[in-house]
């Protein structure tokens, strides 16, 4: 009750706007009358809760963005208990908000994840840290991941993983389907690829994800990744007091994170032992390569607990981003054979005569390959929405958003806005090759923007380019006969509503 009173008091206070706001507040429409938080349109609390819990809203949060924008306009608000959220679904307003970011931008933290770290005495990684701790971690990791040259340095390591993926796809064809070329649940296969790839980069070792028999601890980790997003969505939708009455989602979330931390800790401890041997002068040829992220963190004297926290969270982020995007890309290419044929021709011509690793520089120069990935990320952004919590009053459109207000950036809605993307629900990579109007640069932000942008963007793009080039070099990808179209659903991240099954036919 006290929190509700404080919130009401704060909102009332903000109605009486200060005489002088930050200069950024007047950057647009200075002639307009500024309005307060209470003036923002939106559903009643009752209808908002009904939409969320009684109409399957948790699994279609991305669709609610589109419906909200259509009904209330580019900015609206909704309340859940004492928490009021402002939703922004216009690229101009998204840009206006993000341009006002502070030195350490704060987003809505996965509070249940942070609570798990606190209760289980685990270090926060880049996904759960905030403030100065987040800034320290970001500064430490960015040079190793965000610089294009740094990401390109992992191409040799990833090349071996991609070749193993092609071999695994061959082995999986026809298993349990009756069709000789059909691979069931390609997302499951690409989960294994995603973990193997990010594991090789972070730990410098192979995890066995793409072998005929996947190690049990690796299978446990992969299952935990899929499960934790479901439990996260449930725990975030429930007020804290309800966790005591319905303990299942919280217990499941803790189990999932404990399994992932245990997996990461085993592998980090192995790398710690190798680092100790290096310090003792043991010959390098007796140990795995030292060119991996964990090696650099040990060299920078980062604590083992912090390394484990970061490796755990980066493994999670790396698995889901690559697996879902790769699944959606091949799904769309199987349904658009003309695009697939053109892309295969571009890859063949663009990599002919290249050196041992044509995937490095050559693939980054292929315009259609890059356009296909951009179009898939527009249609199926891994994270359909992002958030910010401003540390001061800011202006968005003609509204003043008070400090500490949760603002949700509706990336799914802006990326399917027909005013930005004609025929927005259609797969059309040509829109990124100069065909049609140029969209607002903030209409599609699959990797975010600014200091809070995805730190693994360069690595993810490299993995996707390399995997697609090898898969399309070896296979023609066809849809499952008689399969109905597949829609996305929200599971914290955006995933297929059911398994994607595809045929991989030798070229």
UniProtKB/Swiss-Prot annotation:
Coiled-coil region = none
Reaction catalysed? Answer: calcidiol + 2 reduced [adrenodoxin] + O2 + 2 H(+) = calcitriol + 2 oxidized [adrenodoxin] + H2O; secalciferol + 2 reduced [adrenodoxin] + O2 + 2 H(+) = calcitetrol + 2 oxidized [adrenodoxin] + H2O; 25-hydroxy-24-oxocalciol + 2 reduced [adrenodoxin] + O2 + 2 H(+) = (1S)-1,25-dihydroxy-24-oxocalciol + 2 oxidized [adrenodoxin] + H2O; 25-hydroxyvitamin D2 + 2 reduced [adrenodoxin] + O2 + 2 H(+) = 1alpha,25-dihydroxyvitamin D2 + 2 oxidized [adrenodoxin] + H2O
Q: Which residues bind heme?
A: 454
| GO terms (BP aspect) | bone mineralization; calcitriol biosynthetic process from calciol; calcium ion homeostasis; calcium ion transport; decidualization; G1 to G0 transition; negative regulation of cell growth; negative regulation of cell population proliferation
Q: In which tissues is it expressed?
A: Kidney.
Q: Name one GO molecular function term.
A: secalciferol 1-monooxygenase activity
Enzyme Commission code(s) on record: 1.14.15.18
Q: Could you name the domain of life of the organism this protein comes from?
A: Eukaryota
Its GO CC terms are: mitochondrial membrane; mitochondrion
Q: What is its main location?
A: mitochondrion
Its biological function?
Answer: A cytochrome P450 monooxygenase involved in vitamin D metabolism and in calcium and phosphorus homeostasis. Catalyzes the rate-limiting step in the activation of vitamin D in the kidney, namely the hydroxylation of 25-hydroxyvitamin D3/calcidiol at the C1-alpha position to form the hormonally active form of vitamin D3, 1alpha,25-dihydroxyvitamin D3/calcitriol that acts via the vitamin D receptor (VDR). Has 1-alpha-hydroxylase activity on vitamin D intermediates of the CYP24A1-mediated inactivation pathway.
Q: What is this protein called?
A: 25-hydroxyvitamin D-1 alpha hydroxylase, mitochondrial
Species this chain originates from: Mus musculus (Mouse)
């Amino acid at each position: 009750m006290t929190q509700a009173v404080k919130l009401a008091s704060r909102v009332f206070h903000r109605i009486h706007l200060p005489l002088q706001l930050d200069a950024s507040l007047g950057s647009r429409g200075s002639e307009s009358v500024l309005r307060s938080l209470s003036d923002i349109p939106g559903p009643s609390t009752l209808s908002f809760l009904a939409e969320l819990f009684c109409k399957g809203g948790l699994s279609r949060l991305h669709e609610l963005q589109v419906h909200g924008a259509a009904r209330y306009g580019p900015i609206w608000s909704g309340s859940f208990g004492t928490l009021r959220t402002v939703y922004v679904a216009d690229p101009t307003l998204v840009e206006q908000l993000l341009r006002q970011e502070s030195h350490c931008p704060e987003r809505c933290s996965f509070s249940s994840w942070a609570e798990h770290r606190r209760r289980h005495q685990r270090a926060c990684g880049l996904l759960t840290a905030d403030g100065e701790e987040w800034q320290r971690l970001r500064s430490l990791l960015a040079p190793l991941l965000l610089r294009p040259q740094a990401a390109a340095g992992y191409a040799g390591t990833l090349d071996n993983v991609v070749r193993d993926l092609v071999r695994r796809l061959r082995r999986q064809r026809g298993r349990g389907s009756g069709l000789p070329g059909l691979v069931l649940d390609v997302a499951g296969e690409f989960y294994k690829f995603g973990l193997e790839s990010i594991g090789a980069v972070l730990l410098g070792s192979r995890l066995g994800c793409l072998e005929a028999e996947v190690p049990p601890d690796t299978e446990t980790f992969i299952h935990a990744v899929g499960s934790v997003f479901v439990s996260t969505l449930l725990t975030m939708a429930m007020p804290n007091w309800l966790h005591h009455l319905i303990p299942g989602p919280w217990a499941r979330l803790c189990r999932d994170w404990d399994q992932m931390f245990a997996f990461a800790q085993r592998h980090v401890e192995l790398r710690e032992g190798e680092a100790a041997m290096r310090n003792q002068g043991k010959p390098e040829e007796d140990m795995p390569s030292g060119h991996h992220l964990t090696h650099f963190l040990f060299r920078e004297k980062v604590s083992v607990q912090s390394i484990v926290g970061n490796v755990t969270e980066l493994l999670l982020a790396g698995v889901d981003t690559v697996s879902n995007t790769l699944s959606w890309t091949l799904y769309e290419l199987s349904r658009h054979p003309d695009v697939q044929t053109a892309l295969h021709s571009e890859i063949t011509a663009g990599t002919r005569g290249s050196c041992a690793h044509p995937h490095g520089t050559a693939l980054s120069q292929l315009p259609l390959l890059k356009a296909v990935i951009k179009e898939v990320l527009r249609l199926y952004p891994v994270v359909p929405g992002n958030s910010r919590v401003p540390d001061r009053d800011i202006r968005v459109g003609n509204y003043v958003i008070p400090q500490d207000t949760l603002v949700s950036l509706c990336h799914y809605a802006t990326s399917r806005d027909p005013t930005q993307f004609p025929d927005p629900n259609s797969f059309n990579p040509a829109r990124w090759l100069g065909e049609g109007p140029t969209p607002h640069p903030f209409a599609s932000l699959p990797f975010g923007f600014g200091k809070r942008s995805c730190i693994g963007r360069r690595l993810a793009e490299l993995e996707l380019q390399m995997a697609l080039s090898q898969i399309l070099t070896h296979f023609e990808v066809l849809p499952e006969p008689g399969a109905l179209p597949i829609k996305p659903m929200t599971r914290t991240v955006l995933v297929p509503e059911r398994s994607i099954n595809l045929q991989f036919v030798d070229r």
